[in-house]
Amino acid sequence: MNDPVFAAPEERVLPTLNNDGTRRWLNPKRSKGRFLKWRALVGWGLIAVFVALPWIRIGGRPAIWLNLPGREFTFFGKVLLSTDTLILMLGMLAIFVTIFLLTALLGRVWCGWGCPQTVYMEFLYRPVEQALERWAKAGRGSTRKAVAPIIKYGLFLAFSVVLAHTFLAYFVSTDALRVWMTQSPFEHPGPFFVMTATVGLMMFDFAYFREQMCTVICPYARLQSALLDRDSMIVGFDEKRGEPRGKGAVKEIRKGVTERQYGDCIDCGACVKTCPTGIDIRDGLQLECIGCAQCVDACDAIMVQIGAPTGLVRYTSQRNLETGLASRLLRARTLLYPAVLLGLLLALALVVSNTTGLQMELIRNPGAPFTVIEDGRVQSPVRLRIANRDASKEMYTIAVLESDVEMLAPINPFPVLPNETDSTTLFLTTSADTFVGGNRTITVRVESSSGQVDERRFQLLGPMR
C-alpha cells in the first residue's frame, strides 16, 4: 500500500520581512484618489476632535476626563465614579458590540479610516517624511540630504510632544497639564517621567515600528477571522476579471480585442507599491490588510489610463467576488448584534436615569486601619468621598446609624460644589468589645440639603477578640 503524499505548504513570510528574516522597510507611494480625499477629511477631523476635547468645558469640567487617581470618569458633563460599575460595564459592552456590528458590516473600516495609528502615520508623520525626501532629492550636493533627517526627526519629536501632552490631558485635565508645563520638571518628577515615556513610545512607534504595530502587535487583525463573514465589506481584487495578468492586457484593452489572452490586470504593481502594510491585494483577504483603499485609488488611476473600467480592486465582499451576487445586508450577525446593542443601550439609559445627584464612597484610609486610644476604645479613620452631580452647590449632613459608634467629622455638613467630587476623613470611635473576628460593620448615611439620601455599609477593622 502506497504511503499518502502530502503537498508541502507554500512558504510565506510577513510582507514586512525579507526572505532571510530581515526587516523590509516600506515607503509606500501615496496614491491620490477619491478614497484618499475622504480619508484625509475624516482623519484630520478626528485629529481636531482629539486635540480639542480636553479643552472643551461642560459644566466646568473637561468634556472627557479619565481621572484614574481620583477614580472618577467624566463624559460630556456626566460624572461616573469607580462605584458605577454597572454603568461602566454596560457602556463597555455597548462599545464592544458596536465594534462587532461595524466589523460585520464594514470590515476593518476602523483600521483604515479611524485608528490613531493609521491616522497619525498616514496624514501627519509619513507626509512630512516624504515631503522632506523629495526636498532632499531636488537639491544639489549633499547639504539637503544631511539636513533633511535632522529636520524630519525634529518635527517627529514636536508632533510626539504635542500628541503626548494631549493624550495625558485626558487623564490629568488641561488645568494640571498647564501648571506642569510652566513649572520645573523637578517639582513634578512623576508626571514628567510619564510624559517623557509617552513621547519616547510615540517616537519609537511612528519613526521606527510603524506598520508592525498593525501586523504584529494589534490583536484586532487576528479577530477579523471571527468577526468577518462572507458578506462583510473587504477590499478585494476581482480575480475573474483581472486574471490572467500581463502587460499585454494594455494592447488588448485599447484595441478592443474580443477574444482576449489577458485579463484587465496589467501586473503594474501599483497596488503593492502603495500599500502601507506591504501586501499584494491580489493574493486575497489577508490579516495585514487594513482596508485603507490605497490600492483601490492606485488601481482605478491605472484603469483610467488604459481605458478599462474602474473597480478591478474595490470595496466588495467575498460573496460578490466568488459568485457575483450582491452582499446580504440582513443575516444572523447583522440582526443579532443590533438587538443586543439596543438592549444594552436601553439598560444603560435606565440605569443612568435612576442615578441620583448624590453618590458617596467609603474608602479605607492609608496606613494603620485603626488605633487603640487611651480609654481602650478603637478609633478608625475612614475616607468619605462625595460626588455632587447636581447643577448647584449642596451641603451634605453625615451620620453613622449605629448608636454605639461615635463619629468625628472635621466639617459637618460638608459642602461640595456642583459637578465636583470632594473628600473628607471621618474618625469613628467604638468599643473594642464590638469587634468579632477583628471586624464589625457600620452604616454611614449622607443627606444633601436638597433631600437626597445615600447609605453605605462599611467594614471596620479592629483588634481580634
Residue ranges with predicted function:
Residues 346-370:
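Hydrophobic alpha-helical transmembrane segments in integral membrane proteins
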